[in-house]
Amino acid sequence: MSSVLERPAAPAILPSRQDGEGSVQVKMDPNLKIGTARVFSVYGKGGIGKSTTSSNLSVAFSKLGKRVLQIGCDPKHDSTFTLTKKLVPTVIDVLESVNFHSEELRPEDFVYPGYNGVMCVEAGGPPAGTGCGGYVVGQTVKLLKEHHLLEDTDVVIFDVLGDVVCGGFAAPLQHAQRALIVAANDFDSIFAMNRIVAAIQAKSKNYEVRLGGVICNRSAATDQIDKFNAAVGLNTLAHLPDLDGIRRSRLKKCTVFEMEDEPELERARQEYLRLAATLLAGTEPLAPAPLRDRDIFDLLGFD
């Protein structure tokens, strides 16, 4: 038997893939457009308060006279419960009930009225370990268009689960003009934000979406976020401190705009209204350069 080891064959050069191809992605329909509405996609580390932020921001837009639609993109389907006061059925649940014959559905089967006129939809998601979130988001937008529900909408907010930015749950970026990142002033949150920045920058090569900025949440200070922003080219759009009143609003199944008047909650309401006005006025498209993982370790920390 020969003892000569054969040199392994050179790896095959894989053909380049278009966006949406591959085993973990869904081919996006380039013709599936939302229309004239201002569309924002909200990302951030899991548990950082994206749904709270999205719901309060939706109400702030509605307080400024805008017709708002919030779309929850999470299998937990709890994005809109402070607006609707309940966990509403998901689009996938409703489609399954009619064996995916969408023509049998009415708008009231999957769109639910929320506080101050905000329209609420929970896209839901496939069972754990199966399917792809991109399909769910695509079906949701398709349904909304079929029923002409996007034609009378001024603002759409996609509230996207955790910091998962695979081809599936990055699907809202196909529709958004601006992506917003909710982050706290801590290492784990900023580490996740860096990954999200990288994913959004990759998607921006094929889609209109650009980063709009950071919403600092549940934080007394912003020094670590400020340090990261300066290093990559981001900016902070709003700062919501860690308020007990905001936590209590979730327990009461309501937004901060429905809570009893308290000085700290009034400041939070004004910050949400200011953020909504800023986004409506238009934010500069940002093109940050994400850091390598090891560089974040070197950058962050107390001096």
UniProtKB/Swiss-Prot annotation:
Top-rank taxon: Bacteria
Catalytic activity field: chlorophyllide a + oxidized 2[4Fe-4S]-[ferredoxin] + 2 ADP + 2 phosphate = protochlorophyllide a + reduced 2[4Fe-4S]-[ferredoxin] + 2 ATP + 2 H2O
Ranges for region Disordered: 1-24
SUPFAM superfamilies xrefs: P-loop containing nucleoside triphosphate hydrolases
Annotated signal peptide: none
Family label: Belongs to the NifH/BchL/ChlL family.
Subunit (UniProt): Homodimer. Protochlorophyllide reductase is composed of three subunits; BchL, BchN and BchB.
Function (record text): Component of the dark-operative protochlorophyllide reductase (DPOR) that uses Mg-ATP and reduced ferredoxin to reduce ring D of protochlorophyllide (Pchlide) to form chlorophyllide a (Chlide). This reaction is light-independent. The L component serves as a unique electron donor to the NB-component of the complex, and binds Mg-ATP.
Protein's recorded name: Light-independent protochlorophyllide reductase iron-sulfur ATP-binding protein
Organism whose genome encodes this protein: Rhodospirillum centenum (strain ATCC 51521 / SW)
Lineage, uppermost ranks: Bacteria, Pseudomonadati, Pseudomonadota, Alphaproteobacteria, Rhodospirillales
Name of the coding gene: bchL
